[in-house]
Amino acid sequence: MKYPKQIRTYCPFCKKHTIHKVERVKKRPRSELSAGQRRFRRILKGYGGFPRPKPEGREKPVKKLDLRFRCTECGKAHTRGRGFRVKKFELVEG
C-alpha cells in the first residue's frame, strides 16, 4: 500500500486542519526494568512451569500499522483511528 508522506488533516491540538507529516512507528525493545517485567522475572524464578497458559489459536500473519501524524505548526503527533493490517507499506511523495 502506498501512503502519502504529508497529509492535510485535523489537528486536535491546534483545533484546525493543517499539514501533517506521516511517521511509521517501529516497535521498541521491551524495557527490562519496568515494574511488570520485574514482577514477571520474579514469578519465573524457582521450580514450576511457565506462569501463564499457552495462547489459544494462532498468531495473525501481519501486524497492525502504527502511524503517527505530526503537525507542522505545533509539532505534536497524534494517531488517527486504529491501525490497519497491510503486508507492504510504503510512504511516497504526493
Curated annotation (Swiss-Prot):
Zinc fingers (C4-type), renumbered ranges: 11-74
Alphabetical list of Gene3D superfamilies matching this protein: 3.10.450.80
Molecular function as annotated in GO: large ribosomal subunit rRNA binding; structural constituent of ribosome; zinc ion binding
Keyword rRNA-binding set for record: yes
GO biological process: translation
Highest taxon in the source lineage: Archaea
Keywords of this entry: Metal-binding, Ribonucleoprotein, Ribosomal protein, RNA-binding, rRNA-binding, Zinc, Zinc-finger
Pfam families: Ribosomal_L44
PROSITE patterns in UniProt: RIBOSOMAL_L44E (PS01172)
Keyword Transcription: no
Chain positions recorded as Zn(2+) binding sites: C11, C14, C71, C74
Cofactor annotation: Zn(2+)
An example Gene Ontology CC term for this record: ribonucleoprotein complex
Note accompanying the cofactor annotation: Binds 1 zinc ion per subunit.
Function: Binds to the 23S rRNA.
Family from the record: Belongs to the eukaryotic ribosomal protein eL42 family.
PANTHER family to which the protein is assigned, alphabetical: 60S RIBOSOMAL PROTEIN L36A/L44
Assembly information from the UniProt record: Part of the 50S ribosomal subunit.
Protein name: Large ribosomal subunit protein eL42
